[in-house]
């Protein structure tokens, strides 16, 4: 189950914090700035650089939307969904939900809090951040580590799964972007050393297939840290994570998944879409870019919908008028397109992003952000 706060904060906060052009100096295709870090060699230089969270303050319509989110479910999910997001949550040290749902909420709430500079929201976010930092063990592992018996409405098993940690990594990356808290750098360095040692024996797909199919989310944070520290082991880890991740490049170039119903999970496709481009920064093989461009064409002819998304009620469906598309698919595809635009500078991805943002997304939430529709029909 994906959650409204993560969905909306991620997609709307994108408008005020996403990648923007930095100073264009010697090479018009490369963003160079003394204030913000581009990719460190040997990673491919990016034409756009993401500004820190909070460096741009919303006004007008955008501010109104974010305030509505604050007053809606995004800012109040700990009350609306207290069983999962309350003090029993495993990411607060409790005996309740230990998987993705808590991190997903904070993935949206944290940027919303710091973009609005809203102390009440920041106070809600900080216990999750502080518990996560304090949970790290000497070997680098972090997060819940105890599986418990089933309880209706809660996910209390697979506590050591790699996937929910990928969501929390994104939370911690955003926290650093907003605050500059240097504890985050040591936290990630220790965790990535743990991953490098642990993944050969316990790969991304050991506990669930989600980590294997969404490994690109892990990979992008590894590169982010490498650009800050320059630690060479991170490049080795990048290769290992890519190798263990579902081979989206081959899926897009050589296989027929996009012409078969039920072949993939619809949100995994949206999240996996960026992985070839994220990895392209390290291996710089043009086939990674060719793969995602081919995928766009294939989707248009089979499972695609006019919104730019695809049919999928969990699993892929052909793009027929009666076929639904998940709200989760919309925002995860938007995030993938943001990353792809930042890395390549190709305005094709900006156009695609706009198409999804203004056609798919608005139909699936109420104006006051108090409710959302899981599936939409075109």
Question: Over which residues does each language-model region extend?
Answer:
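Non-catalytic N-terminal targeting/anchoring module and adjacent flexible stem/linker
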Residues: 7, 22-23
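Bacterial N-terminal signal peptides that target proteins for export
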Residues: 1-8
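Hydrophobic transmembrane signal anchors and adjacent membrane-proximal interface regions, especially
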Residues: 2, 15, 245-246
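Bacterial N-terminal signal peptides
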Residues: 9-17
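Glycan-recognition and catalytic cores of secretory/periplasmic carbohydrate-active enzymes
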Residues: 23-378
């Amino acid at each position: 189950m994906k959650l409204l706060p993560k969905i909306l904060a991620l997609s709307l906060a994108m408008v005020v914090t996403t990648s923007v052009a930095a100073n264009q100096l010697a090479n018009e295709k490369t963003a160079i700035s003394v204030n913000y870090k581009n990719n460190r060699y040997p990673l491919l230089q990016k034409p756009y650089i993401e500004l820190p969270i909070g460096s741009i303050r919303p006004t007008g319509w955008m501010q109104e939307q974010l305030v509505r989110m604050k007053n809606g479910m995004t800012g109040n999910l700990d009350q609306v969904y207290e069983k999962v997001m309350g003090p029993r949550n495993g990411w607060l040290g409790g005996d309740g939900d230990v998987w993705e749902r808590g991190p997903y909420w904070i993935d949206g709430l944290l940027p919303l809090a710091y973009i609005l500079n809203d102390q009440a929201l920041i106070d809600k976010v900080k216990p999750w951040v502080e518990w996560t930092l304090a949970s790290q063990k000497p070997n680098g592992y972090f997060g819940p580590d105890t599986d418990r018996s089933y309880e209706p409405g809660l996910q209390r098993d697979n506590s050591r799964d790699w996937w929910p940690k990928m969501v929390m990594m994104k939370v911690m990356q955003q926290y650093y972007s907003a605050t500059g808290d240097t504890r985050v750098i040591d936290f990630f360095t220790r965790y990535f050393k743990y991953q490098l040692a642990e993944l050969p024996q316990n790969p991304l797909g050991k506990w669930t297939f989600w980590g294997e199919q969404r490994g690109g989310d892990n990979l992008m944070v590894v590169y982010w840290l490498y650009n800050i520290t320059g630690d060479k082991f991170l490049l080795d880890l990048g290769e290992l994570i890519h190798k263990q991740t579902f081979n989206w490049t081959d899926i897009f170039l050589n296989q027929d998944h996009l012409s078969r119903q039920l072949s993939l999970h619809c949100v995994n496709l949206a999240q996996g879409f960026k992985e070839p481009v994220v990895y392209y920064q390290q291996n710089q093989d043009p086939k990674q870019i060719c793969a995602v461009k081919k995928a766009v064409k294939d989707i248009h002819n089979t499972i695609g919908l006019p919104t730019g998304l695809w049919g999928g009620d969990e699993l892929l469906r052909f793009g027929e008028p009666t076929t639904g598309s998940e709200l989760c698919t919309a925002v995860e595809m938007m995030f993938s397109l943001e990353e792809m635009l930042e890395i390549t500078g190709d305005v094709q991805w900006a156009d695609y992003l706009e198409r999804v943002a203004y056609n798919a997304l608005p139909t699936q939430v109420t104006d006051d952000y108090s409710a959302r529709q899981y599936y939409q029909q075109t």
